[in-house]
Amino acid sequence: MKPDYKLVAKAKYIHATADLASELWHEVYKRYYPAKQLDTLVEELQSADAIEEDIDNDVNYFLVVLGGKTIGYFAWKMENTALHLMHLYLKPEYRGKALGRDIVLSCERLARGEGKGRVWCTFKALRYRNLKPAEQENGTVPRDEVVFEHTLG
């Protein structure tokens, strides 16, 4: 079964996205940030007000719905030469099922259709210590974030 992507535009969906973001961010980042700092990050970056401000600045948020259940969300912004995938979060039980890959492929198709040459995103390097390009020889990650860029052919 393929998920549906529901555009977040109305206030009730903005609030639902903010609630989901809080749940997922607390689950994903609890290992890396103290609770109070994480609460502040969520409030500043993924609260209903922050999401509404993003939407006002041309960021497109989508809820990921599978079988009538909201299982995640993603957000992207079209830039001059690229589509910037800003957020992609799925509930734990839906990870590893190629749903994220399908979202990225959808973004690639959209970018191509808009005449953009690439899709890019950043992710927390601390979550992916097995990525060799992000590691130094001593096994430490030199930066908190790694940029992934895919040039469209």
Model-based region annotation:
Residues 72, 132-135:
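A structural microfeature
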Residues 4-93, 103-110, 114, 143, ...:
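Acetyl-CoA-dependent GNAT
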Residues 117:
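Short acidic/polar active-site loop segments enriched in Thr and Asp
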Residues 94, 98:
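Glycine-rich phosphate-binding loop
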